[in-house]
Amino acid sequence: MKTYRCRAYIMTLLTLSLVIPGVSAAQSNQDSGRRMSQIDSATSGVHDFDFLVGHWRVHHRKLKERLANSHEWIEFEGTLSSQPLMGGYSNVDDLVLEVPGVPYRGVALRSFDSKTQQWSIWWLDSRRPLGPVDPPMRGTFKDGVGTFYGNDTYNGRPIRARFLWTKITPTSCHWEQAYSPDEGKTWETNWVQDITRVH
């Protein structure tokens, strides 16, 4: 009888030794899956601007006068170089704008917030090298289109500003800026960039 109980006890231990690691492995896989899901969720938008990394030629079109019913456009060329920072959570563009008679340089800095899943964008250029830095534009990408909004002033009046990134391919993309003087009811596009990759 004692021998039978001993054998039964040993068999139980053997069975548990086989089952428990399987349960532990399954639990570990579930935990790992949850962690990966959380990481994916937190970083799902962090690669939105990867398409822009590299060196580009830019054809610019800018309205000569903004919010003045102007239909006269100024066209000029330029360059753009973009690189990622902070492991992809930020990136910076260095732009050369070959405006006839008044060329200048500009810097666009972007930073990704994993909590809100939004990008913030700041602009500074050599016409005002000591600032102030423009108020940030904030937004996201959806269905291949990046849409960003911000509050600003133009000629002393409050406006809403909007950036759009569209027509994104490995070798080209399109950007435009628009202002609204009436809280977004109407928009005037005042700056357009057609961007073509150099390398």
Region spans (language model):
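N-terminal secretory signal peptides that target proteins for export/translocation
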Residues: M1-C6
